[in-house]
Amino acid sequence: MRQILVLLLFVTLVYGLIRVPLKRQKSIRKTPKEKGKLSHVWTQQGIDMVQYTDSCNNDQAPSEPLINYMDVQYFGEISIGTPPQNFTVIFDTGSSNLWVPSVYCISPACAQHNRFQPQLSSTYESNGNNFSLQYGTGSLSGVIGIDSVTVEGILVQNQQFGESVSEPGSTFVDASFDGILGLGYPSIAVGGCTPVFDNMIAQNLVELPMFSVYMSRDPNSPVGGELVFGGFDASRFSGQLNWVPVTNQGYWQIQLDNIQINGEVVFCSGGCQAIVDTGTSMITGPSSDIVQLQSIIGASAANGDYEVDCTVLNKMPTMTFTINGIGYQMTPQQYTLQDDDGVCSSGFQGLDISPPAGPLWILGDVFIGQYYSVFDRGNNRVGLAPVVPYPPLMNGV
């Protein structure tokens, strides 16, 4: 009888979850790389790939390194307004604002994407404030509006969001997403906006104040994974969740004990800070460490990227990220990316984040694809466990 009750409770929790399917599509980096123009993109954005680094200076306005979004492949759908206007967004735990292009945007990138038309929504209100976000060498700017936002059937009322009227450079022209929905803490939200998930909690729209992310690394799966609001799905991971306290409530920031290569501590020997970030595609770290790491794994700069020989993956070292005393191992097959043309690229990228926020390591999609990640706002902690390979996910299952 006890086993039956436990099973019924599990089924109730699983089917009470709000699931947002994540589609896997071509990344921003993919298109210029296919055209042989990736090096030109880096030059335009002021990113010196020879030095293996991008930088983020906290003395500037709130900043998002543009390189973080270059390889993001996981996107979901939301709608804004009444009647609903649909948008494809990155669900980004590394930022806290929701923004989409405005119909009044004059940038080339906006013309290629869905744009919000406030005059068509009966529930829209103007906030009257402006906002600006720094992306690489340019800034994204616009106005703040208030409207209803729907995420997989969850109706969030009176949500503040950015309507971009100017987007930087030409990089977002090739993006598969229209905008970004931030899932970080309110302290890093620009313009005093309350993040979407905070409003979900305040409006009693979720069972528990947590959400979880599953990302499939199977390139042949048409559905990339899922974002779950209100809890987690234990069928998506093996073993138990290992909980890690959040050390700074801005990003989902945690303590990283050390980083090992083939069992030997090489980086972060005295401990360092890291963030678990669905909006960053790769694993990033201080450029001086990444230069050394790329050399260790045999990656070399080529065609605006860092490539490794696909035929020697079995000879490359194993990486282990030790977090709260638990080792999270990654094989070469897991920390490299293989293109359709058979070229393998390193899953590591240099990124210098200035104090006081940095230096930081960022555990992006390359890491999250191997470890189911739960973001618990109620207890300010992150849960991690090895993913269970799944058949293609079906919407709403």
Curated annotation (Swiss-Prot):
Pfam families on file: A1_Propeptide, Asp
Homology family: Belongs to the peptidase A1 family.
Annotated disulfide bonds: C105-C110, C268-C272, C310-C344
InterPro entries: Aspartic_peptidase_A1, Aspartic_peptidase_AS, Aspartic_peptidase_N, PEPTIDASE_A1, Peptidase_aspartic_dom_sf
Annotated Gene Ontology cellular component terms: endosome
Major localisation: other
Organism: Xenopus laevis (African clawed frog)
Molecular function per GO: aspartic-type endopeptidase activity
Top EC category: hydrolase
Active-site annotation: D92, D277
Entry PTM: Glycosylated. Contains high mannose-type oligosaccharide.
Cellular compartments annotated: Endosome
Propeptide residues, chain positions: 17-49
EC id: 3.4.23.34
Lineage: Eukaryota, Metazoa, Chordata, Craniata, Vertebrata
Role summary: May have a role in immune function. Probably involved in the processing of antigenic peptides during MHC class II-mediated antigen presentation.
Subunit structure: Homodimer; disulfide-linked.
Domain of life from the UniProt record: Eukaryota
Keywords assigned: Aspartyl protease, Disulfide bond, Endosome, Glycoprotein, Hydrolase, Protease, Signal, Zymogen
Glycosylation positions in this chain: N86, N130
Catalyzed reaction equations: Similar to cathepsin D, but slightly broader specificity
Signal peptide: 1-16
BP term (GO), one: proteolysis
PROSITE patterns for this protein: ASP_PROTEASE, PEPTIDASE_A1
Name by which UniProt lists this protein: Cathepsin E-B
Tissue-wise expression: Expressed predominantly in the anterior and posterior adult stomach and at much lower levels in the larval foregut.
Entry-linked PANTHER family: BETA-SITE APP-CLEAVING ENZYME, ISOFORM A-RELATED (PTHR47966), CATHEPSIN E (PTHR47966:SF26)
Ranges of residues in domain Peptidase A1: 74-385
